[in-house]
Amino acid sequence: MKANIAMASKQLQFIRSLIISQPPTIALPNQSSNISKIENIKGNDLPNQKTLNDPEFQSLGQPASVLAINSPPSVPIYIRKNSLLSIYGIDNSFVNSIKGSVEFINPLKRFIYGGYVSKYQKIISTVPFSLLVSSSSKNFRLRTNRQKSFATLLLDGTNDWAVLNNTALQAYTGGTLNVSMFRIPKNISKTLASLLKITNATETGLFRWNNLGYALLTGRGQVGLVGNGAIYNINLKENEEVLISRKNLLSISVNGPYDLQNCIVKYSFPVTKPETGTIGSTKEAPVQLNKDDVIPANNFNHYWNIIKGYSRHIINFFKRSQRLTYNFLVGNEDFVRVIGPRNLLLQSNSVGSHSTSSSELPKPNLSNIKANIEKKSSDFLNYVTIEPGRGAVFKSTPNFRESVQKIEKKSS
């Protein structure tokens, strides 16, 4: 026993705890040292009062639902259409120096891979200025009450990012930053299959017919991503693995457009059949009821409640059958297995988490409530009689005196 404990303690020393953080900015190594942090949009923080070579992205609030952008002159800022809250400058002269235009980014590929075309507003000025960008855009197709938050990425050219949610790209800037669309791989690569010792074709778990593509971010620049709920960062080292819900996976670091199939594989939890034991298999003796013990129900409400009860059971049966059929055809859980080294961005709420079914409580019937209130309480007495061939027979009566008189007349 002591030897087993010693071996277990030695094994635990090689396990690295997985750290999940929630930073507002995901900074990659070797970042430029001239990027400073800002707390809010104030007069002393405006870029025209200090030396600013690159734009600054800073998420504000808890949760971070607003993105503050400080931009130097002649640097274009791209934000999603209808998400701009305000534009601020040190004096009134900045209004005449700002120019804006609407641009479509890969409209054909976005329509084919994602089923929609998103518009971005390009803002550029000859003087420094500041922007406030909202995490939600006023689009009729994307109108929702879900809480969203920002996470900013700093790309220095050493790593690329695959954004799996096509509506996550809210703002970006960078002279060499490239935003392109690629098809999500359906199966894993041969390299990953040989590493995992898989012989047959295995799916990545990311491919869906209603969402065929992802956005690839390459080059140098800054990006503001939007996720449902809060956004968390997971850093996986070499040969580390983690199971992630596909709907909650917002973005992942990759090395080129064809690296996504080298790190993700579909995972299905093993389904165990329920044990069929002998517990509860003993047959109970049926209860015999006398005709006098059964009270006939002639009330309409009684039969109506029976019909509603059976209808409720039928509806629940069809819902359960639909859920079991979906789990059988699609899978019991929608998880993917991610293999490091990778950086992951997770959103706490999935896209379809708001459409949860809730069972409604039955509304009380006022007529039944009034009838129960107006109904007078009455006492029922139980008595027993000895009948030949039947033995002791228990009965109930509201009037004990009348029952005694009936028994005396019957015996006489």
UniProtKB/Swiss-Prot annotation:
GO terms for biological process: inner mitochondrial membrane organization. GO terms for cellular component: mitochondrial inner membrane. Keywords: Mitochondrion, Transit peptide. It comes from the Eukaryota. The keyword Ribosomal protein does not apply. Its main location: mitochondrion. It holds the Pfam family AIM24. This is Altered inheritance of mitochondria protein 24, mitochondrial. Residues 1-25 form a transit peptide. The keyword Transit peptide applies. It is found in: Mitochondrion. Belongs to the AIM24 family. It comes from Debaryomyces hansenii (strain ATCC 36239 / CBS 767 / BCRC 21394 / JCM 1990 / NBRC 0083 / IGC 2968).
